[in-house]
Amino acid sequence: MQPMCGRLNRMLGNDYKDQQCSIAGALEVIGERWSLLIIREVMLGVRRFDQLQSDLAVARNVLQTRLTRLVDQGVLEKRLYQQRPKRYEYMLTEKGLDLWPTIVALMQWGDRYAAPAAGAPVLLEHRGCGGAVDEHRLCAACGARLSARDVLASAGPGARADHPLRRRAAAKAAQRAAA
């Protein structure tokens, strides 16, 4: 009997191009270590290079290579937001937005099997009413079907003090207090 995704005895090379499998094809686009984390960050509103680099603690050259690949693959779009010096932000394309169910499923799987004992590091909530996102990507409070555009992220009980979402929340609170 032939396995679904190629032969078991075939040695896996540096890529999946010879695999006749949709999962292998998807991994060619998003399977690199940083790719899904970059997509998650952009989905949650982090779109500029410096913020992505800071939040992910990834080397600048690695981030640039991954962003270029995601743009070339049509997952992200690069948009100019400043002329001098030229600076860009990264937006999800329709192809990138279609990864929303995958991102939520991986987050929820990680919350169940790989989160700190304190709980989920990131909580997703409905922008409209504040309800939690359930396993079907529905709002647990109002029942609305949610897309990436409908959701806000906040630091969960498992987020360390230095988590980017905690730092951003503290900075916003300080700005409000100073105003």
What are the residue ranges of the model-derived segments?
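N-terminal helix-turn-helix DNA-binding core of bacterial DNA-binding proteins
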Residues: 21-62, 176-179
